[in-house]
Swiss-Prot record:
Function text: Catalyzes the transfer of the enolpyruvyl moiety of phosphoenolpyruvate (PEP) to the 5-hydroxyl of shikimate-3-phosphate (S3P) to produce enolpyruvyl shikimate-3-phosphate and inorganic phosphate.
Binding site residues for 3-phosphoshikimate: K28, S29, R33, S171, Q173, D318, K345
Protein's recorded name: 3-phosphoshikimate 1-carboxyvinyltransferase
Primary gene name: aroA
Disulfide bridges in this chain: none
Length: 440
């Protein structure tokens, strides 16, 4: 079997069913935070299971630019913090990582000195005003391109004051940026969300000794420094989603993902799979370093359409491209609402998935905040413009399994390396191989 290309075009032509037991790479959200919180700490942080992908490499380079030392010791990555974070000597390039840029904006607001945060062409199109505006309420001196809407972001760090923030949209990145700024602020910083977003920041800061107060949808902190410690990163459910959704919809499939993070703020996908009729089983449920994990098995069954909205959306926002593919194979109508956040990801994922699935034969109607998909519908081969978005590329690679043997051609798969460099190899492992063209 020839290796799938790591950049350039790829022609996907696989056969199902999907069968096997796999492990997916470490959770991206937890990996970012492990490095960043380690750099903020008073002591050493040792991380196992850290995601080895471009987005996390961006955070690693950033914390090194701020004075932290990051070294590989066998299966562990060790973060040694500086006595105090220093002003970076150059622009910090966050690559494609919105998490890096937004969380660093919060941290650097309280670090004396001048910092400039930028990224690749995709990241420079992603909005930053919803981070900048609440940080300014805390006294942060920030500016950005296009009327403070878009990166690069210029941060002039200085004294901050605590504030109470009411977020209009649940966002773990915005919440985390404000809480991290709160670690440098005078007085209490509180964040209230309309729905609960992923809570890795709260769990990890608590695990490192920071008093984090949670009351319903409100989270608050005061000035503090984490103590460091040990972090064991579970598998990323957002990466597993492509295999779980494919297995649920493709007859004869059964896939087990071992050591998968099942934090309740991230398991909206499992709820949706069950609601649609998939056979979902969890084994060896345990908690390690404050994060629950399990071996998750999904077996194909006849799927029924469902409605996905409200508090479920923040719990599966990154999994929705895979869910949209699965919905094309479910009987009846699947409706997704309250997902406007999809329009400001690495691409406008609603528009991208809607347009691409429609060309592949799906019956799909787009709304400003979601879509409706009627099924089941046999799909056909299609050429896909990935738009530098890893989740579009991976979702459409799985969609090819429902194309009756016709190929799906991805125009450039380099973006997959931002979160899941081994994706195509693992997909080959549980299905049949792709035929491809591109860089080896």
């Amino acid at each position: 079997m020839s290796a799938a290309p790591t950049s350039g075009p790829l022609t996907c032509r696989r056969a199902g069913p999907l069968r096997g037991a796999i492990e997916v790479p470490g959770d991206k959200s937890i990996s970012h935070r492990s490095l960043l919180f380690g750099a903020l700490s008073t002591g050493e942080t040792r991380v196992t299971g850290l995601l080895d992908a471009e987005d996390v490499h961006s955070t690693r380079r950033a914390v090194e630019a701020l004075g932290a030392t990051v070294r590989d010791e066998g299966a562990e990555v060790v973060v040694t913090p500086p006595a105090t974070l220093r002003e970076p000597g150059d622009v910090i390039d966050c690559g494609n990582s919105g998490t890096s840029l937004r969380l660093l904006t919060g941290v650097l607001s309280g670090v004396p000195g001048l910092s400039v945060l930028t990224g690749d062409a995709s990241l420079r199109r992603r909005p930053v005003r919803r981070v900048i505006d609440p940080l300014r309420v805390m006294g942060a001196d920030l500016s950005a391109r296009d009327g403070d809407r878009l990166p690069p972001v210029v941060v002039r760090g200085g004294p901050l004051r605590g504030a109470r923030h009411l977020l209009p949209v649940a966002s773990a990145q915005v919440k985390s940026a404000l809480l991290l700024a709160g670690l440098f602020a005078d007085g209490e910083t509180a964040v209230v969300e309309p729905e609960k977003s992923r809570d890795h920041t709260e769990r990890m800061l608590r695990g490192m000794g920071v008093p984090v107060r949670v009351s319903g949808l409100e989270v608050s902190v005061s000035a503090a420094r984490p103590a460091g410690g040990r972090v064991d990163v579970p598998g990323d459910i957002s990466s597993a989603a492509f295999f779980l959704c494919g297995a649920a919809a493709l007859p004869g499939s059964e896939v087990t993902v071992r050591n998968l993070g099942v934090n309740e703020t991230r398991t909206g996908l499992l709820d949706v799979l069950r609601a649609m009729g998939a056979d979902v089983r969890l084994a060896d449920l345990r908690e390690v370093a404050g994060e629950p994990r399990a071996d998750v098995t999904v077996r194909a069954d006849r799927l029924e359409g469902t409605e996905i909205r409200g508090a479920t959306i923040p719990r599966l926002i990154d999994e929705l491209p895979a869910v949209m593919v699965m919905a094309t194979q479910a009987r009846g109508r699947t409706v997704i609402r309250d997902a406007k956040e999809l329009r400001v990801k690495e691409s406008d994922r609603l528009a991208a998935m809607g347009e691409t699935l429609a060309r592949a034969g799906a019956r799909i109607e787009l709304f400003e905040d979601g879509c409706a998909i009627d099924g089941p519908t046999p799909l056909r081969g299609v050429e896909v413009r990935t738009r530098l978005d890893h989740r579009i590329a991976m979702a459409m690679a799985v969609a090819q399994l429902f194309c009756g043997g016709e190929p799906v051609v991805l125009d450039d798969v380099a973006c997959v390396a931002t979160s899941f460099p081994g994706f195509f190899r693992l997909l080959d492992q549980v299905s049949g191989p792709a035929s491809g063209g591109g860089a080896p």
